[in-house]
């Protein structure tokens, strides 16, 4: 959806190399860098072709080099190319909710055109220093393990690490649900270079869990933007900017708190690397593009809190060959405020969300930001879980009875803490049958402090499993004790 100017410049294709086109324009009528140009014509089979490209280089001799946003199959030399006079622009605002878009802002869910008053270009400057929110504040998610041990920063960036099948999608959907209910905010999901099947699964699950309301789309809580694995690298490189532009509108114009999901940030870097090679740039370390830091920075710096609203971004991070020193994840880490690590061991135990309490980190967990009470409680929880982890080998070889009295007590409380870190989700009600729970930070701290102080040692472990606040655990425990008599 590129806007057109009254005077259109027209050129013609001189060379096609995969997703990269060279186009010749009349003297003095060259398009600017990042302008959208459109190739229109018929292929050899007589079918209409419309391909939008983005200008990346001005080569001299009235030639420009552009990267295609869709397949270049059927494009022939000599085909007419029109300069739109502006960057790729996408629809923004409430009409985007509940819909799926491609990189150009065109709906791809077969639900008809999007009627939208305003569009915005995907290339925009990051907010000025004077517009930024200077105070660090916590973004409460209502998920106990996250809020207590690795709290999110309002307007911050969070890395989400986890393999297949440990609950990334369910956690993402719960966060989308909770921001809508607790903060009156909306979410934008950017699917960058991931599997089309996963994108379809996510869409279907969102409809099932009512995150997307099919009967009343504007009441949905999320807009989806997909540029999947089968797309050319130009689309995968720019789809994150399309999603971010939609999120910026909700922040700057609607003054809302927005969650922006990027799955997967590594694919954004990978697509940039492919485009860089196609444009003939000299590769940098490990074959990545020399502009890696600049590209990542221009995306990440737009994700921030302003005085009007905030964009909090949760980015799934794929670590190639589990090598954290690889330039792609290493560049990403420099921008992150918190990490949420999902553990297969916890998922195997049935503890959901399977967030690893010891591996997950946050720069917000400081007494000056979260307060002494929260900080002390979090450190005690981490301490007792670390002690339990250290004793695991002894327990598995010799059994619990061989431990000292103090260690046995620590293990008993750690097992209660571990179970209390689990929580029923609203979006999982469809599968589990148990109603979801949103737990305030105050209730979370109170609950864990009571367990650590030994006030609930008489309750069975099972009473802390998949409950909301501590009162629910106490009621469940008393019921279990009454049944056991």
Swiss-Prot record:
Keywords: ATP synthesis, ATP-binding, CF(1), Cyanelle, Hydrogen ion transport, Ion transport, Membrane, Nucleotide-binding, Plastid, Thylakoid, Translocase, Transport. ATP binds at residues 162-169. Its EC number is 7.1.2.2. It comes from the Eukaryota. It is found in: Plastid, Cyanelle thylakoid membrane. It is a peripheral membrane protein. InterPro entries: AAA+_ATPase, ATP-synt_VA_C, ATP_synth_F1_bsu, ATPase_a/bsu_AS, ATPase_alpha/beta_chains, ATPase_F1/V1/A1_a/bsu_N, ATPase_F1/V1/A1_a/bsu_N_sf, ATPase_F1/V1/A1_a/bsu_nucl-bd. Gene3D superfamilies: 2.40.10.170, Bovine Mitochondrial F1-atpase, Atp Synthase Beta Chain, Chain D, domain 3, P-loop containing nucleotide triphosphate hydrolases. GO terms for biological process: proton motive force-driven mitochondrial ATP synthesis. One of its GO terms (cellular component) is cyanelle thylakoid membrane. It catalyses: ATP + H2O + 4 H(+)(in) = ADP + phosphate + 5 H(+)(out). Its main location: plastid. GO terms for molecular function: ATP binding; ATP hydrolysis activity; proton-transporting ATP synthase activity, rotational mechanism. Disulfide bonds: none annotated. F-type ATPases have 2 components, CF(1) - the catalytic core - and CF(0) - the membrane proton channel. CF(1) has five subunits: alpha(3), beta(3), gamma(1), delta(1), epsilon(1). CF(0) has four main subunits: a(1), b(1), b'(1) and c(9-12). Belongs to the ATPase alpha/beta chains family. Produces ATP from ADP in the presence of a proton gradient across the membrane. The catalytic sites are hosted primarily by the beta subunits. This is ATP synthase subunit beta, cyanelle. It comes from Cyanophora paradoxa.
